[in-house]
């Protein structure tokens, strides 16, 4: 953020130069730095109607889940969301959402919501003060417990949360609801973690453990259902579909995916949850509906386990004189055919034309793990010179952490960048997608050419999509181009996203399934005796290995690590689950057993699943939890 080049709202972030080689750069950043980066992002960078506080809050919560220090999250969260007691930032979120959705609250409802915001911040401030007074008493006798204040605050949350679920405005108010839910769940977690110090009885503690589980379930399901109802109604071009999804992920699902992890402490979350970006402009693709999304989603995610190194393609420039001998001409610059390249010599199928020789290669130049892509320019447009001459342009350009740029054309238009996110994959679509592709999602690591129907005017073109996520603790690439996950140097726990596998057998019956409350997507097994292998660089620490799974029917899980086999039989989550319905998956977190991540060694972890009932199985998260910090419920 030290230098800003104003060219189509382009920002070059030199701050990344400092942290490009640090696989735990996010964990090492201060909250103040994170706040400044999101403020700068909003000031100079992005066209999305997103208030910067939403990025700060998600980063703050992730850091607290990964820390042992934050026992009073609510107090700090109040200072971020309501600085100096002001509700302005929450009102900013509402105004931005109104602009994005082109919908407004009526006058009475707006007044009601603003009153609830004022009341909520005052209630939390008063509770925080009561806790401070209890911990630092200035009068006698000193109360033995703060249970009364805790129970009063709990009831106030229950009274105020429904005011952000008003009929007819559920989607518009969803970002505010998510923030209110953040505060309520943080409050409950604080009560559990501070029970001894606050004089909370064992019975009350059990009640609040149940609250954490139950309200995580209720709030997650509400957010997922509200989003999915809106998404199912979409019928729009790709840019608008992806922008809607990205907006809701930044404002809502970044939080939903953290809530189910609130039961853990000192757990560094290696997120596989993605933000997607595509270009805007007149030269864009067909319209899509929610029925097309399973294919599009599979196309964007299919090679997520590989280390991205760049793209290659065919760029063409063609000039035609105006018809009828009129003066002037039309020049078109376009990307015709594209292929995504990864470490280990792996490449995707072709996008667009399949019969053209590629004439450019765009790569990170330096090793992709040291200097990954962080920014994309994907717009297209038309420049006019007078009334007779025009130029149609298409960018498809990328920038690394060291500000090195490459692509089909020079960077221009709006750029796509999110603080602490890296471009971990690139995908794309042709002008029109064949129906036989739209109805057939790609299986895991499938290489398939995606082209327009024969004879489609402009069908050779490729329009790229950049895939952004926070995944950064990557040690190296395996020989096959997949990622080796790096365990933290200290005794902090960590996670591995199941879609980031080293290899999977039965690939034609294995798919990536979209999830919203899980810090990334699941690996869906549709054939029995499927094994997913993961590689991690160990740190010598001992962990309890938890697997988050969904098995609607009986399954058997066998985990092999360091030559030892762990077996869990009769896994059926139809009723034995945490209550969240995450896009059809119902999950608990299963304790597989105690394992050791051997020090300074590449450790393989094999997860084999037998489908005893023949029903699909979702592997949703892999969690290495410190042995001395069991889950809160």
From Swiss-Prot:
It holds the Pfam family Endotoxin_C. SUPFAM superfamilies: delta-Endotoxin (insectocide), middle domain, delta-Endotoxin (insectocide), N-terminal domain, Galactose-binding domain-like. Keywords: Sporulation, Toxin, Virulence. The keyword Coiled coil does not apply. The keyword Glycoprotein does not apply. One of its GO terms (molecular function) is toxin activity. Transmembrane segments: none annotated. Gene3D superfamilies: Galactose-binding domain-like, Pesticidal crystal protein, central domain, Pesticidal crystal protein, N-terminal domain. GO terms for biological process: sporulation resulting in formation of a cellular spore; symbiont-mediated killing of host cell. Signal peptide: none annotated. Promotes colloidosmotic lysis by binding to the midgut epithelial cells of both dipteran (Aedes aegypti) and lepidopteran (Manduca sexta) larvae. Toxic segment of the protein is located in the N-terminus. Belongs to the delta endotoxin family. This is Pesticidal crystal protein Cry2Aa. It comes from Bacillus thuringiensis subsp. kenyae.
